[in-house]
């Protein structure tokens, strides 16, 4: 062998290894699933490359996974004829470059997650150290020579060019030197059970090197020959007698052979009624690397002009990187006539359904399809349309069980709202799946459909309020009149609600109306209308004074018919941003600031004529519109209204000073008196004297 090069593990990987080695995990068996899954991925890659270039398979035409237990040396070997690794791949992928999931996986482990999640974070290879204290990887890639990677996980690993080992042709061979207490993993029965449990549905043959003992019957002719030689004489015997006396002898002969473990045909080729829940769960786990079972499954086939079979799964919880834009989703595996084509096919399902896992096997797509031609492919567009339809059907099936749907909605509500924003064709269908808290729903969530059935007589619109949290909006001044009239209001407190509701203008013919925007119209009796007109007239002067004081801060000041208890509130234009949307946009680091100028619409101040503060303010303003206290109070009211209406203050310090001034007034403290009192006090001669005099006073 050539000289070995030594490399240090990247710090995070080193941490991960010490965590895997030094912590007790009960389900160490998952290591085999992870290593077989890696082999399957490597085989997928070479098979895909060979579709366009057959010569890629010359080094090793067969595609397989072999498992060899060795009781003599206490090793377990896993060999695949996959794509193999170059020297650079070995160094980077197995030690020096941490994947994005390394840190997240360690954090998840620290938070009590199961070690079997390791595959979801892309660091499944290191699970080998759950059962082995030394791992040797020999690999051959078509573009490089054969190399050996070796490590006992002590902070470093070596890579050596393999000049003397057995030539692989192409692929990877992993030898695990098992720990003394992990010898169960060289037992044939145990290995077979593990492959059946976790890797039954891998689409390549997984063969186990098994020991076979055969009993052979042999006649004892040879023994007789030996005896004759020893005695040196031949006894004459009757032939018949000789035949009778000839005995048959049994001997045990040991042989080895490959035994195919995953004999099942692809699960999606079988009829749904023939498959039980456990089989679906096993297939889901092998497909997704999830340690939990799925929440729901949809197994269907489409026939006619276009033929394909598919199985779709909804997980129980959202993955840690659900909305990671850098990560390509690889949740739907695409097969063509049972041949795996690709697993991060972005065009097969819209982004908002990126959490759905599964497989699609098409009869019509060409085998040599590439990503570039896939985008233009009409067949794929039809498959995509069908998948979206079936996903939505599946969600409605989940919704039939309230408990399951609550789990689903908690994990994936953002995806549904993203669907409202992006998928105009299915918008009305997705809207039926939305759930919100409301002024009448208590701790339960309500659907838009249920809201419509509870609407009051004569109510034509669906009312909602957006905000930062349920707590922030449930006592909002915007809801006062609506609550008084017994009208239900939906709380939309997810940041993405603002975007979704911008697209969902109505539901079942009922317009969605924001309680925080101008133009809120509620049914009024003749008496109410008359009273409103009188109050408008009465408060006209105050409205003008407030507008003069606030200037450009507000567009107009009007008498409100939406606030009942609060003195005032600030509403936004019907087509501009709400206060909540303004908050969201300000929080975006890469926002287009020019857009904020025209989208954050001018505010309208609505005053409550029946509030005692407003009534007193009106009297003062009518008496003297230049009264300084009126100006101060108007500014204070405006700033508090900004806060209660969900806006942020541009000058919090000024607001703080105003509050302090009001506190002093309330406590009858005069600033001038405080200054004078300080001036009258004689300077202290000495600290010690001061302390002494204090002591004398106590005496």
Curated annotation (Swiss-Prot):
Residues 219-248, 676-699 are annotated as: Disordered. Gene3D superfamilies: 3.30.230.80, 3.40.50.11260, Heat shock protein 90, C-terminal domain, Histidine kinase-like ATPase, C-terminal domain. It is found in: Cytoplasm. The keyword Zinc does not apply. SMART domains: HATPase_c. Present in all tissues. Most abundantly expressed in roots and floral bud clusters followed by flowers, young fruits and rosette leaves. PANTHER family: HEAT SHOCK PROTEIN 90 FAMILY MEMBER (PTHR11528). Belongs to the heat shock protein 90 family. Homodimer. Interacts with OEP61, OEP64 and OM64. Interacts with SNC1. NCBIfam families: PRK05218.1 (NF003555). This is Heat shock protein 90-3. The lineage of its organism: Eukaryota, Viridiplantae, Streptophyta, Embryophyta, Tracheophyta. The gene is HSP90-3.
